[in-house]
Amino acid sequence: MSHLDDLPSTPGKYKTDKVPPYGILHHHRYLRLSKLTLWASLFLALFLFYLVLSPPPSPSRRNLNDSSSISAAKYGGSHWEKQVRKSARPRSHGGLTVLVTGASGFVGTHVSIALRRRGDGVLGLDNFNRYYDPKLKRARQGLLERSGVFVVEGDINDAVLLRKLFDVVLFTHVMHLAAQAGVRYAMQNPGSYVNSNIAGFVNLLEVSKSANPQPAIVWASSSSVYGLNSKVPFSEKDRTDQPASLYAATKKAGEGIAHTYNHIYGLSLTGLRFFTVYGPWGRPDMAYFFFTKDILKGKTITVFESPDKGSVARDFTYIDDIVKGCLGALDTAEKSTGSGGKKKGPAMFRIYNLGNTSPVPVTKLVTILEKLLKMKAKKKIMPLPRNGDVEFTHANITLAQAELGYKPAVDLETGLKKFVKWYMGFYTGSKKKSSW
């Protein structure tokens, strides 16, 4: 019996067969190309401005990406290359060969295991930064290793390492999930967002466009790009030029930059705007996660309300549903049309919302957690601060349903029940503890 068979929630509990090829898509239908190009130009200028004015980090002021200083010279040799090739080798006929960046992150772990379980080849890359406790990432790494996924420890800004990986493996696809996450932390460490979400993405695109053959790329954008948009539900064709946080701005910049590389170099690119992903093995900086921790410890939790005293609401999306969307995007991605940095024809460019399309007030989230934990929360109601958070999110998933076969199936209470079961096992040593 597999060590994953008794999981409270695992990639693989749902059907992960490949989505049939979509064919020729009208993939420019919702995109305003001129605005994307403008955003790409603006944020490339922002990045250059950052590079020029930023002083070199001193030993006492290292950012979260310390691991980016690790040279690719650390890697190589026959044993290392054997591990890389073995992990990336598909086990099924016609299987994909996928480089997953941010593989030991929340979404990256689930996607990597789902791909591996259906027979695809998967190679992980992660820098194990300290944005949250690296021990959680190391534990996820253990799951990946037991599933046959080798994770290279390195940074997406390390061009030498990336080129080495592309030399060793002919990747058919890249699932780019590495990023500096979190809305509020951007106010404390803005440089890390520019470094990872813009510079790191550009570095990956540079290496990918020079590859022969070029891989198709699916990358994580964010629902945060909708910013101050008040039209609901949020649709891919809605305006995204009013970001409410630096995190959102870097994600929007990524979309513009991706379009530029698609247009100039023929890279096949698909962006996925995730809406508040939650579930087992999640991120400790997310509300559902630290609410659970603080309720169990008897600490007061802060619940924000909108300026009109209404409840802040989120389109909470369970991790298994997000994984389905990621696999659907990979399976329907057309091949890139360039080779060795030269475009040979138009290439696919797509943007999709991946949400649950059922916004839930945060107050209801707390009520569900109280029920599952059998403890009453000590709540402090506060006005929503102007630190980048928005009052609500609501995804229109019509496009993803039609073109990716995306159908979210897990409601918030069911998903939180699975999360709490995992949390109690992982952090409290519950007898119901599972390998997930």
From Swiss-Prot:
Annotated catalytic residues: Y247
Keyword NAD included in the entry's annotation: yes
Keywords associated with the record: Carbohydrate metabolism, Golgi apparatus, Isomerase, Membrane, NAD, Transmembrane, Transmembrane helix
- Record InterPro entries: Epimerase_deHydtase, NAD(P)-bd_dom_sf
Keyword flag Nucleus: no
Q: In which tissues is it expressed?
A: In leaves, pollen and siliques, but not in roots or flowers.
Please state where this protein is localized. Golgi apparatus, Golgi stack membrane
Which Pfam family is an annotated match for this chain, by its short name? Epimerase
Q: Where are the transmembrane segments?
A: 36-56, 95-115
Protein name in the entry: UDP-glucuronate 4-epimerase 5
